[in-house]
């Protein structure tokens, strides 16, 4: 892998009058990496992508591709290609003409265009379809044609702006796997923009979680999921039960708290140096919570109690149980075990639950930013 990153942003900022859309963002993407920028609507991720593509000029900072600044390079001269959410295929052209459009604009001769188009269509699994109309393709095939149209130009970086957003759920799940396989096949750096955490977690080598114009955390999918560095990342990446609490005592990283609803909890300081008396936000994943018909089994875990079943959200392997803690009234979302042991639970049943302190992450509070 090359020591010079394919893409590097150095303190990139973008202001729209008094509004700061992107605030001094710095990162680098090594060659051949699937890099995702994940965040909610309005966080600045599309603005950042448009600056990389050259459609918008940064207010400050520098942007380098293969070690060379491209701030003064127009979009059509940058070694990047872009796949949009709605693909922008030309309906009046056949598939081959769509894929070869960029090569024609570059003045490549017809023989070479035909060879390169056939080669790239083979690589995306669409060999022999060059003469077919675009309208004859399925949604997934159109997606591959859009990627082929970009990859035939051999860009250093491929930018993808929520390209799966217009697809139905089943096809979207399939295309997540296909996109990752295509990226590996071409060994090209992908920079992928999405608000869908599942897309980012499944496909990416590295993920940057963006919020209010800054990167909250940059890391692997596992790091973001199991070791979120901020309360925003803990709440945005994956599902979590969230509580507001006050710290009772701290011993190293071990934190004992009382929630606003009066429930005692033990957890782990997420590296923010919380102290006695601090207000904190507490997170625990639904799959970290264990169920039992015997309170003695969960009573030794460190956190938990007895809860009344309020609802059962059946979703196959992703089914969840909604409990109301009998002591505090707090709501708990708990992933249903796949053993089938608790599938007979019904609304109104009481069941014991618990989880270990190591599964509880504690962050300095930003009260007013959550609904609990």
Where do the language-model regions lie?
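The feature captures the beta-strand-to-loop junction immediately N-terminal to the Walker
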Residues: 38-40
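ABC ATPase nucleotide-binding domain helices that frame the ATP-binding cleft
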Residues: 46-49, 145
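Helix-to-loop junction immediately C-terminal to a conserved catalytic motif
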Residues: 53
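Conserved ABC transporter NBD signature motif
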Residues: 61-69
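ABC ATPase nucleotide-binding domains
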Residues: 75-81, 85, 89-235
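Non-catalytic connector elements of ABC transporters
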Residues: 240, 250-372
